[in-house]
């Protein structure tokens, strides 16, 4: 038997969905402005800190908009020190593969999975976020082939601890035009994360959504430190001075190797998994 897989229906391409659910010129302008500010922070031209903040997953559109609308007030109070990127995570990696997988799979948690409604729902949610709050947001790049459904709306993506060793994630990250945070894996090996950043900062030729594509590399690929569980089942934190010093030494080792360099060295500490 060739495939144990039932093909249910062909979904619209990202281009088709963008034509069906276009963004306004105002949304385009907001994203361009925020993307520039974020680049300036990563390049060291702006000394503000980036704060990616929000719930574990987005499962209710109105609740998400209410939450990030409140962040707008917070942003005004801290705008000289902190640049807020709301976290709207619309797909969830599952440790054992079962359970609620996020709005992309199941736009209504009380109903059955529907991927067509899901891709529409996540696009409408991110569009509404920009229009109503002025925030472009962050999402997890759980499925690299789906990134272009939201590529005109997002200002930040993360590659999770379970995905960071995957080649397609690394190569796709090399071609997105926004910062990509690479997490250390669940076992805590910093070198895996560093290798992922090196791959993402270099150009590649590969297959993507039925095309042969080429990329120039993403100079804003960077580290996300998360806590982990060691081989003895102990929870190891990620936020101590020693952890940051260790990461700095890894950056320095890479840039001293003469084989490659990492542009715009940066770190975000994942306090959800500290």
Task: Please give the residue ranges for each predicted region.
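N- or domain-start disorder-to-order transition segments that initiate the globular core
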Residues: 1-45
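Active-site-facing alpha/beta catalytic cores
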Residues: 2, 68, 81-250, 257, ...
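Glycine-rich phosphate/diphosphate-binding loops that line cofactor/substrate pockets in enzymes
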Residues: 39-47, 256-264
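Hydrophobic "anchor" residues on beta-strands that sit immediately upstream
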Residues: 50, 83, 266
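Conserved, mostly hydrophobic/aromatic
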Residues: 54, 269
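Short, glycine-rich nucleotide/cofactor-binding loops
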Residues: 55-62
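Active-site/ligand-binding-proximal alpha/beta "capping" segment
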Residues: 247, 263-267
């Amino acid at each position: 038997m060739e495939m144990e897989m039932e093909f249910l229906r062909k979904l619209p391409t990202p281009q088709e969905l963008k034509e069906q659910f276009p963004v306004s010129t105002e949304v385009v302008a907001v994203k361009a402005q925020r993307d520039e500010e974020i680049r300036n922070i990563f390049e060291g031209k702006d000394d503000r800190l980036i704060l990616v903040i929000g719930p574990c997953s987005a499962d209710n559109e109105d609740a998400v908009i209410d939450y990030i609308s409140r962040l707008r007030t917070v942003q005004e109070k801290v705008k000289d020190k902190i640049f807020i990127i709301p976290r709207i995570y619309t797909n969830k990696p599952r440790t054992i593969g079962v359970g609620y997988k996020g709005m992309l799979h199941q736009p209504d948690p009380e109903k059955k999975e529907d991927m067509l409604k899901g891709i529409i729902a996540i696009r409408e949610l991110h569009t509404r976020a920009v229009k109503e709050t002025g925030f472009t947001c962050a999402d997890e790049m759980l499925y690299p082939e789906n990134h272009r459904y939201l590529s005109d709306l997002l200002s930040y993506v993360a590659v999770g601890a379970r995905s960071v060793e995957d080649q397609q994630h690394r190569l796709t990250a090399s071609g997105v035009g926004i910062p990509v945070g690479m997490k250390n894996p669940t076992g805590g090996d910093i070198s895996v994360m560093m290798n992922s950043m090196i791959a993402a900062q270099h150009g590649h030729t590969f297959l993507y959504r039925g095309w042969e594509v080429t990329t120039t590399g993403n100079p804003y690929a960077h580290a996300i430190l998360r806590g982990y569980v060691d081989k003895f089942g102990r929870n190891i934190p990620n936020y101590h001075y020693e952890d940051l010093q260790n990461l700095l030494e890894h950056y320095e080792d890479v840039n001293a190797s003469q084989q490659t360099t990492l542009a715009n060295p940066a770190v975000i500490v994942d306090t959800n998994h500290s």
